[in-house]
């Protein structure tokens, strides 16, 4: 079926009738311009100018007469002209047709007696919108230029309602059907859509109904066009109501791609028009010639006609001859008038800025591509890239130290994520969680103004992360939409309860098919929730992370790769290729003999190790925080390699870390959490086991009085002494040797990572600055390690529960263990003073440090409460240091238990200094009531209220 050619219409509002222009403007053509008016208000401007000129006939009678003659002449001209049919394919006007219109516009504006009416701009920039300031709509606007602000049009355009999925599927199916040899029917359908838009009652600029235009348009329309329109309308109606059997997978595929983010293009006085960005669809979904194959002369394209430096996020009319898919896929066709309407291309000032969320072809970090369709309505693309920078930003120029308090340790390599051409393949849930973590502390203007912006964005990112993660349902059945699809599934008499077991997984080795990325996503969620006031709720996410890590067998080394491509010894020579090779997502769970043929990169192996050791450390840390037993056992990771040095890890020098120990470490080896904090958590695990064995309701008393108890305590004490010696060796290696200049032959770790960590690191231009930064970082590590080591001594010898400690029913204060524990409490306070000297805001490890500061303070509170004015000066100084440390913690990572204990400690310190209140007994009782909220005895849950 051939599509009737659409003629090239004359210039509709030309006030002059030239010889070269043999036809005028038919009244029926006015309604036909509604399609153009959907994209811009250029035609409305021309109509307004013409009527203004007609109203000022006294000022310029010739112009008014010429305009009336032109309008009356247009009524007598036929709608189609053979000469114009021959040139209908041309999208450009010749000079004879263009110049009279330009001259007419100049004459009308020159002779208009009234002042120009200020037109309302279509959209204000983001800064003016937030500040509620008048904006001129330019890019950049005058307000932003005056105050030096960043002028952007990146926020989402609000809309009413959303496009129907049925309409999207029907339109895509119709386009695909047209590309398979039925282009004529597709043309008729699209023609019917435009005709249905044109068939609305004609309105002038003031909104009045013009019945003559409407009746003339209907009566003057050729019969063959009416027939085509009717056929197109009926065909479109059928495609919307009847299910599509020829393309069964297209609609479901589009639904699966979450095309829920639509940007609205609003024209004044016209209904909203939604347009979705389909660039995220895979090639298999799109038809061979694109979505517009049935209508190559589509007039809707996403371009910016104003300046070349601005993003391609504007809406204008243009031909798509170069790329038929351009109007739908957001590409930029050449700016010109469409061939079916020979109007001159209006100036950029006539285009209102219909801002869409751009999907720039020059994405700074291509790793974000999977999550871009989901975050388009939440944050701009540039902000997403900035948040990735925040996530990987290091606060130290010498050694890696995450600046975000919610990034407790680096699991992934920065270069793998931020690589410009070959980034790591990541799940959308992991990327969304990383953006959510970074948005908690980012100082981007988009998140700080207005003050409620951060909370709104973080809430949307959290909902997106959970939606993409589908908690506890890692393997949904095909076509199932609900995450709880198996909640009522019963197979062989067993209720599966919605924990990820589907019909096709019953014969698999495991019930979950989650990948390493899912575990990391759980870690991000759990970390932020743990740092909030809802600490008990964080255990849901931690438990899911620990369980999935155990199912993935992250505590075991993967079998070696099949070495058929390279001989022994050749792996180290191709380290660059290994670093650039994007690792695949590990979704295989049973790494047994049957899966030994899987080739896994060394980077992916190290990711698995670091993820396990991070979970291992947090398991022991939270066991102390929440008074709970251990989940991950030492025997599960006895053969797992210890994590490699963070600096070597980020550089990707896997060959330098080929020789490592296996099993949980007990010595300080580096500046990162894995180097100095993980060994302490290994020792803490033994202390936690002893604590719960001592308080066991049945075997606790017998174990406490047995020789086995003393032997276990001595073993843990030896581990603490070993850690203390390694800490001194570590300090000597990275302070004394560097100061004397004898560490030049050490592995180039101190400065090797400076080319990829942070701008501050890259700006260090001298060796002296790097050495001083390394020494400062080392002293902070030693101070934190010393403090936590003293606290572990206290936990091993003393009582964890503050109320039992203050009541002292068993007279533990008179024992030798109390004297030993008290000396460690003073030592911990001295280490805290050194920490405050090097890290005044306690931002080095705020997520972990709070509980150790609290447990190390209970003995000082006991001394202040019991001794009061008789306390020694060292105890008084220690109490003052603890109060200052808690005040710094409250500023950095504000939590309720730190605020509460600060008040309790200040009250006790006032009594030590002699300021005893009249209600002394009530003050002591109130302190005990406050401390009773946090119990570590019996069924107490510690900090988890």
Swiss-Prot record:
Predominant cellular place of this UniProt entry's protein: nucleus
Keywords assigned by UniProt, alphabetized: Activator, DNA-binding, Metal-binding, Nucleus, Transcription, Transcription regulation, Zinc
Ranges of compositional bias, category Basic and acidic residues: 565-581
Subcellular compartments: Nucleus
GO cellular component: nucleus
Domain of life: Eukaryota
Alphabetized Pfam families for the sequence: Fungal_trans (PF04082), Zn_clus (PF00172)
PROSITE patterns: ZN2_CY6_FUNGAL_2
Annotation: DNA-binding region: 125-151
Annotated region described as Disordered, given as residue ranges: 1-33, 53-74, 172-251, 559-601
CDD domains referenced in this protein's UniProt entry, alphabetically: fungal_TF_MHR (cd12148), GAL4 (cd00067)
A Gene Ontology BP annotation from the UniProt entry: DNA-templated transcription
Biased composition range(s): Low complexity: 14-24
ATP-binding among keywords: no
Keyword Calcium in annotation: no
InterPro entries: Transcription_factor_dom_fun, XlnR/Xlr1, Zn2-C6_fun-type_DNA-bd_sf, Zn2Cys6_DnaBD
Comp. bias intervals (Polar residues): 177-188, 218-251
Coiled coil: none
Gene Ontology terms, MF aspect: DNA binding; DNA-binding transcription factor activity, RNA polymerase II-specific; zinc ion binding
PANTHER family recorded: XYLANOLYTIC TRANSCRIPTIONAL ACTIVATOR XLNR-RELATED (PTHR47663:SF1)
Protein family membership: Belongs to the xlnR/xlr1 family.
Function: Transcriptional activator of the xylanolytic system. Involved in the regulation of extracellular cellulolytic and xylanolytic genes and in the regulation of the intracellular activities of D-xylose catabolic genes in the pentose catabolic pathway (PCP) in response to the presence of D-xylose.
Listed name of the protein: Xylanolytic transcriptional activator xlnR
Record gene name: xlnR
């Amino acid at each position: 079926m051939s599509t009737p050619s659409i003629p090239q219409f004359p210039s509709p509002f030309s006030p002059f009738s030239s010889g070269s222009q043999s036809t005028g403007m038919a009244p029926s053509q006015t309604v036909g311009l509604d399609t153009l008016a959907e994209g811009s208000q250029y035609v409305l401007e021309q109509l307004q100018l013409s009527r203004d000129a007609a109203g000022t006939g006294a000022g310029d009678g010739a112009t008014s007469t010429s305009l009336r003659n032109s309008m009356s002449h247009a009524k007598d001209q036929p709608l189609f002209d053979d000469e114009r049919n021959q040139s209908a394919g041309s999208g450009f006007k010749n000079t004879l047709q263009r110049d009279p219109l330009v001259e007419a516009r100049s004459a009308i504006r020159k002779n208009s007696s009234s002042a120009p009416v200020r037109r309302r701009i279509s959209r204000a920039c983001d800064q003016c919108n937030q500040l509620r300031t008048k904006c001129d709509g330019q890019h950049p606007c005058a307000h932003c230029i005056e105050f030096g602000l960043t002028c952007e049009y990146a926020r989402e355009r609000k809309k009413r309602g959303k496009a129907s999925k049925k309409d999207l599927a029907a339109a895509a199916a119709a386009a695909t059907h047209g590309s398979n040899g039925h282009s004529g029917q597709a043309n008729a359908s699209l023609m019917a859509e435009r005709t249905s838009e044109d068939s609305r009652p004609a309105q002038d600029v003031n909104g009045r109904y013009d019945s003559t235009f409407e009746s003339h348009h209907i009566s003057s329309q050729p019969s063959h066009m009416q027939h085509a329109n009717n056929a197109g309308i009926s065909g479109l109606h059928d495609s919307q109501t009847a299910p599509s059997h020829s393309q069964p997978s297209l609609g479901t595929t589009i639904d699966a791609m979450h095309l829920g983010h639509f940007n609205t293009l609003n024209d004044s006085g016209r209904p909203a028009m939604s347009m979705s960005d389909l660039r995220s669809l895979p090639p298999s979904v799109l038809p061979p010639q694109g979505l517009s194959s049935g209508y190559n002369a589509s007039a809707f394209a996403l371009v910016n006609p104003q300046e070349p430096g601005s993003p391609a996020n504007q809406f204008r009319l243009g031909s798509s001859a170069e790329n038929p898919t351009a109007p739908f896929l957001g590409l930029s066709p050449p700016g010109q008038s469409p061939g079916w309407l020979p109007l001159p291309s209006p100036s950029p000032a006539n285009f209102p800025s219909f801002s869409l969320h751009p999907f720039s072809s020059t994405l700074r970090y291509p790793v974000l591509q999977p999550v871009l369709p989901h975050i388009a309505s939440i944050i701009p693309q540039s902000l997403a890239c900035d948040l990735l920078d925040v996530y990987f930003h290091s606060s130290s120029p010498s050694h890696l130290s995450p600046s975000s308090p919610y990034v407790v340790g680096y699991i992934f390599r920065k270069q793998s994520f931020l690589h410009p051409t070959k980034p790591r393949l990541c799940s959308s849930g992991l990327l969304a969680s990383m953006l959510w973590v970074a948005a908690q502390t980012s100082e981007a203007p988009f998140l700080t103004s207005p003050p409620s912006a951060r909370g709104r964005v973080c809430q949307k990112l959290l909902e997106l992360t959970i939606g993409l993660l589908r908690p506890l349902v890692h393997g949904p059945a095909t076509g199932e939409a609900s995450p709880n699809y198996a909640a009522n599934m019963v197979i062989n008499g067993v209720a599966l309860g919605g924990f990820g077991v589907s019909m096709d997984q019953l014969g698999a080795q495991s019930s979950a098919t989650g990948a390493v990325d899912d575990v990391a996503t759980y870690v991000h969620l759990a970390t932020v929730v743990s740092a909030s006031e809802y600490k008990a709720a964080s255990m849901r996410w931690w438990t899911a992370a620990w369980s999935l890590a155990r199912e993935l067998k992250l505590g075991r080394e993967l079998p070696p790769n099949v070495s058929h491509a390279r001989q022994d010894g050749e792996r180290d020579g191709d380290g660059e290729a290994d670093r650039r090779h994007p690792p695949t997502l590990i979704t295989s769970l049973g790494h047994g003999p049957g899966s030994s043929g899987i080739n896994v990169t060394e980077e992916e192996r190290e990711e698995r190790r670091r993820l396990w050791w991070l979970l291992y450390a947090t398991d022991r840390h939270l066991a102390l925080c929440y008074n709970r037993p251990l989940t991950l056992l030492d025997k599960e990771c006895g053969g797992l390699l210890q994590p490699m040095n963070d600096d070597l890890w980020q550089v990707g020098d896997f060959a330098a870390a080929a020789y490592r120990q296996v099993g949980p470490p007990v010595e300080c080896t580096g500046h990162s959490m894995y180097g100095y904090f993980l060994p302490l958590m290994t020792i803490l695990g033994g202390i936690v086991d002893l604590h719960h064995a001592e308080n066991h309701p049945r075997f606790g008393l017998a174990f406490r009085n047995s020789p086995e108890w003393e032997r276990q305590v001595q073993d843990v004490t030896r581990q603490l002494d070993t850690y203390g010696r390694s800490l001194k060796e570590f300090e000597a290696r990275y302070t004394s040797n560097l100061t004397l200049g004898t560490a030049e032959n050490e592995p180039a770790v101190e400065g090797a990572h400076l080319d990829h960590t942070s701008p501050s690191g890259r700006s260090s231009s001298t060796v002296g600055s790097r050495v001083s930064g390394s020494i400062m970082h080392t002293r902070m590590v030693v101070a934190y390690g010393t403090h936590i080591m003293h606290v572990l001594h206290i936990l091993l010898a003393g009582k964890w529960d503050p109320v039992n400690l203050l009541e002292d029913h068993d007279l533990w204060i008179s024992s030798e263990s109390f004297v030993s524990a008290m000396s460690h409490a003073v030592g911990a306070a001295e280490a805290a003073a050194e920490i405050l000297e090097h890290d005044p805001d306690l931002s080095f490890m705020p997520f972990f440090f709070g509980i150790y500061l609290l447990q190390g303070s209970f003995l000082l509170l006991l001394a202040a409460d019991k001794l009061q004015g008789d306390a020694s000066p060292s105890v008084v100084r220690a109490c003052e240091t603890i109060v200052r440390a808690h005040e710094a913690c409250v500023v950095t990572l504000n939590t309720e238990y730190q605020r509460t204990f600060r008040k309790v400690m200040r009250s006790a310190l006032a009594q030590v200094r002699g300021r005893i209140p009249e209600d002394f007994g009530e003050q002591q009782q109130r302190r005990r009531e406050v401390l009773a909220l946090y119990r570590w005895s019996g069924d107490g849950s510690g900090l988890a209220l």
